[in-house]
């Protein structure tokens, strides 16, 4: 992912007057035009959160701000909400991990099936990024067609409606010309949290601040409401039949409305 995926949602957020937003869309360290972390030391999502909070305070939001994220950004947003008093509320559209054992409702079963498909058939890239980071980085940095194949297939299989070829090429070209794909997968090396499991299931990162969640049917890991509620102070949960992993790109107006409604409800 990159900031390109968030550009379509910005006009909807900026146009909101109740509430009104200052929208900050930072690139994570090492992504596209953002400076990389040092290669001689580990750099985790906890470090990313620390730098993002430092950025927000430096921009004048030391009295409080809202954090929002999907995919890796959702991990960073959770860490921010759990560890930094400057973060007043958190909205997510991804919450990877397995929650407590529950009996799924009929409405939840398609999402569980989708989750099973992803974990059984489409999860191999995570293991490659995590355990063979340098190997896959060398391969994808050596050939733009290889990078297109690796990234492009995710756009196709993780979206509700496939993005246009131009949209896919824009993202892949950005990775290629900035030569940043290898360092962008650094976070996978420290994929688990301190408790040995997914960030979102870490009891030490349970969110006491208000949590909002947007669930999209074609997300790679759709999350039942009760699972999300087990990870924090859930005050707003919305399920959408249309939309997938790249919600800000696919259905920006829908996600923007969820964010605005949540902020209006939870911000104090």
Language-model features, listed with the residues they occupy:
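Catalytic cores of eukaryotic secretory-pathway lumenal/extracellular enzymes that build
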Residues: 1-161, 179, 185-189, 193-268
């Amino acid at each position: 992912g990159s900031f390109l995926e968030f550009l379509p949602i910005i006009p909807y957020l900026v146009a909101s007057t109740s509430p009104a937003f200052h929208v900050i869309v930072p690139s994570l360290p090492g992504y596209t035009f953002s400076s990389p972390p040092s290669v001689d030391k580990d750099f985790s999502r906890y470090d990313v959160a620390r730098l993002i909070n430092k950025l927000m305070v430096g921009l004048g939001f030391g009295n409080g701000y809202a954090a929002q994220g999907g995919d890796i950004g959702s991990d960073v947003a959770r860490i921010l909400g759990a560890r930094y008093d400057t973060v007043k509320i958190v909205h997510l559209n991804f919450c990877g991990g397995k929650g407590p054992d529950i009996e799924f409702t009929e409405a939840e079963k398609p999402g569980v099936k989708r989750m099973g498909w992803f974990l059984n058939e489409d999860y191999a890239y995570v293991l490659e990024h995590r355990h063979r980071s340098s190997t896959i980085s060398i391969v994808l940095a050596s050939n733009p067609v290889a990078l297109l194949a690796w990234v492009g297939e995710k756009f196709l299989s993780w979206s509700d409606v496939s993005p246009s070829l131009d949209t896919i090429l824009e993202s892949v070209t950005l990775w290629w010309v900035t030569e940043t794909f290898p360092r962008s997968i650094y976070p996978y090396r420290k994929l688990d949290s301190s408790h040995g499991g997914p960030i979102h299931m870490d009891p030490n990162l349970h969110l006491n601040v208000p949590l909002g969640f947007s669930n999209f049917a074609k997300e790679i890991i759709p999350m039942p409401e009760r699972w999300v509620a087990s990870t924090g102070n859930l005050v707003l949960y919305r399920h959408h039949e249309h939309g997938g992993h790249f919600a800000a790109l696919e259905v920006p107006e829908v996600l923007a409305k969820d964010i605005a409604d949540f902020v209006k409800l939870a911000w104090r």
